[in-house]
Amino acid sequence: MVHSQLPVAAPLRLLCALLLLPSATMIPGGLSPRSVTDPDVQKAAEFAVQEYNALSTNAYYYKQLRIVEAQSQVVAGAKYYLTMELMKTKCAKTTGKPKVYKEIQNCELPPKAQQEKLTCHFQVWSRPWLEKVELTKMSCN
């Protein structure tokens, strides 16, 4: 009897050990959840909002309401996958110097009946050693 249980014991111990690993263990090249308050996530979100406003043909700026979800992936640098809520502001885009993130965040919102909220998915690729950040994907609805 004891002999027949031996082959099962080793795989069972391995399975138990794997289940005890912390859930936040990073898988190389895989997506890992990140806290929405993480400073790197915050920087990526600021960049995404600025780029969204620069690329959008809307006449008004959109500001960040909140980061809904954040994940990262270790690539040649770090890629951040962000789900964010943006809200249309009363600040009109004008020719000349575009507003920076902090200025956009200070823009007033229109009255409740006129508010337009977007849910956006952004991918931001950061390569600090090259001093380069890129918005690689963006979709909003």
Swiss-Prot record:
Chain positions of motif Secondary area of contact: 73-77
SMART domains per UniProt: CY
Covalent S-S links between cysteines: C91-C107, C120-C140
GO molecular function ontology, one term from the record: cysteine-type endopeptidase inhibitor activity
Compartment(s) of residence: Secreted
Keyword annotations: Disulfide bond, Protease inhibitor, Secreted, Signal, Thiol protease inhibitor
Note: Negative results: the recombinant protein does not inhibit calpain-1 (CAPN1), a C2 family cysteine protease and legumain (LGMN), a C13 family cysteine protease. Does not provoke cell death (PC3 prostrate cancer cells).
Function: Inhibits various C1 cysteine proteases including cathepsin L, papain and cathepsin B. This protein has no toxic activity and its function in the venom is unknown. It may play a role as a housekeeping or regulatory protein.
Residue stretches in coiled coil: none
Gene3D superfamilies for the chain: 3.10.450.10
Family: Belongs to the cystatin family.
Protein name (record): Cystatin
Signal peptide segment: 1-26
This protein's GO CC annotations: extracellular exosome
Pfam families reported for this sequence: Cystatin
Main location group: secreted
Cystatin domain boundaries: 29-129
Tissue expression remark: Expressed at a low level by the venom gland (at protein level).
InterPro entries (alphabetical): Cystatin_dom, Cystatin_sf, Prot_inh_cystat_CS
PROSITE patterns, per database record: CYSTATIN (PS00287)
SUPFAM superfamilies: Cystatin/monellin
Site (Reactive site): G29
